[in-house]
């Protein structure tokens, strides 16, 4: 398989499912008969039974009836394709047919049952079993999973399911999906986990014909990179890509009862499948100069698989019931056309974007860093030897050189153990030195503290170096674990037995294929040899044989006429659909032209027409951006400036109006002048505390200003010395009553006269102090 043929045809197989319970209850007849040995499928038209219409017969590479087993289908049809992918070819397996005919069962099957597992899980086992049995080869296996839902590409392995991906194309790699996530897998369990995660995100719905109908086209991509040492001593990398495609089934709204969202999904599904049929027809028709790959994202992704660099197997799934005879015939006709598609597969050797090469270079770089670290530590280890007394001394150069070979041999036997022993020895050494410093009482406290800090720093550095080395070692092991190498952890005897069994199965499948081809060839040559060998003993025998041959030829003639009539009917139907589409597009185009001619100026129309360009990458018409380049055909004119600071030309009247009134009509800028909308007051005036009226009156009286009181006490002391009673009475006379001041508020003064006993010469008397509260 190292070299491919110049071209090879797409391999087409047909699988017919058994009658389901609904079809049995509805008493539908079985109209499909399958001849497994001859590779033929015959379909009887139930409406043509009365007119004795002959069944339509189709011949394929291989056919499988309702009694076929999953493993039988895989060994005979798909195993050679997966083997070619392991040798560096691109391969594609896709299931095609009406909804509810068993496409998903063929591709996925029942995972927990080994006998009913589909193509995808069987291919997983096949790939990793082949890798485990390989010798002197390194493999890297990556998996991606995407779906095309309503003509939008979604990554089923991404956390953000709302994100839509874009299709890109490069001359060296062809069509690819930008930013599609890819996961490196090391075993069947890991790749099955990737598949299960994607299946949980896939769009599935229920219809009248299928309770678990796929509402999107799903493509599971396995990329296998293999590195092998060539005769020139260099590593050569082969990259094979396996596309496992589970197409959504074509459906009719009258049968599925699709409504609302299901109807929209069915419309998009039928459009993409119709585009796939057009691509198949264009590839088969030698007169077609254009292949409409860009009509659908599905056909763009399958561009290499249909007429490109790939080996392709198409599984056409059909139903046996008379209820679906039209869909069955359509599927068989498309499959019959696909047999004539020619692909040109080639081995993908030493691609530029091989991830395996990057892994190998990164592993080599990390190992080099690790060897430098371990080499530096080994040199330190050889340079310093600790004596019995705890003193360090250096060895001679000759002794160091003598030890190199021994240590290298030991490291070759068990490098990891030596590195671990080295770290343990260094740690014990530092701990021993730290304890010696702690027990040495002759050192000064400051010197002891300095030495302890230095040992702690060395211990920290040692831990950091150890962690860095462990991190590098773990990284190398993790990257090496992703590179799969065969011949490990396998019992050789069991391995050889499995190889022999697989070779026997492949030989049996190849023998069946050759037998089927020989029978088909014998069937074709029977007619030619029959005429040469025929000898007649009588005229009656000759008449009987010729009559039998005539009937056979007449039945073939009727079959060919029926095929021609069906082809004409299909052509007429397709032509009517094209005419209807053309009429709708013409009507819409006339409406657009009418709007443009009546509402858009001719200059603006010409500008738009000259700027419009078709983007083949996105399959859309786009407008080229306007630039300020002087020599450009689409030069953008600058705005006329009437004055500095204004973006628009203004008249004198407009300028005066701007100054006189705040009107937005004459504003030069798109700015409105609005008054400030002040908020409501957030503070209050100060209000003093409320005081009772009596208290307020008392305070007012106490704080009122009073006139000065003059008292003549000249005779008070003279009389005070002669009569004590008089002095007492005089004292009582001059004393204010305790009742307080009168309510009138008038000031009361003590009357004085010359005859008063208080008047007279002596020391002056002063009034007593008065307060609010009597003493």
Curated annotation (Swiss-Prot):
Compositionally biased spans, kind Low complexity: 718-734, 756-765
Against CDD domains, the record matches this protein to:
KISc_KIF3
Q: Composition bias, kind Acidic residues: at what positions?
A: 389-413
Gene Ontology CC terms: cilium; cytoplasm; dendritic spine; kinesin complex; microtubule
Residues that, per the record, bind ATP: 97-104
What's a GO biological-process term for it? Answer: cilium assembly
Provide this UniProt record's keywords sorted from A to Z: ATP-binding, Cell projection, Cilium biogenesis/degradation, Coiled coil, Cytoplasm, Cytoskeleton, Microtubule, Motor protein, Nucleotide-binding, Synapse
Please tell me whether the keyword Metal-binding is annotated for this protein: no
Compositionally biased residues, Basic residues? 374-385, 735-746
Q: Does the keyword Nucleotide-binding apply?
A: yes
Deletion: any effect?
Loss of function of Kif3b only results in ciliogenesis defects in a subset of cilia. Robust cilia are still present in the central nervous system. Mutant have rapid rod degeneration and delayed outer segment genesis, but cones appear normal. The mild phenotype of kif3b mutants may be related to the presence of the kif3c protein.
All copies of domain Kinesin motor, residue ranges: 9-341
InterPro entries named among the record's database cross-references: Kinesin-like_fam, Kinesin_motor_CS, Kinesin_motor_dom, Kinesin_motor_dom_sf, P-loop_NTPase
Subunit field text: Heterodimer of KIF3A and KIF3B. KIF3A/KIF3B heterodimer interacts with KIFAP3 forming a heterotrimeric (KIF3A/KIF3B/KIFAP3) complex.
Q: What is this protein called?
A: Kinesin-like protein KIF3B
Q: Which organism is it from?
A: Danio rerio
Taxonomy of the source species: Eukaryota, Metazoa, Chordata, Craniata, Vertebrata
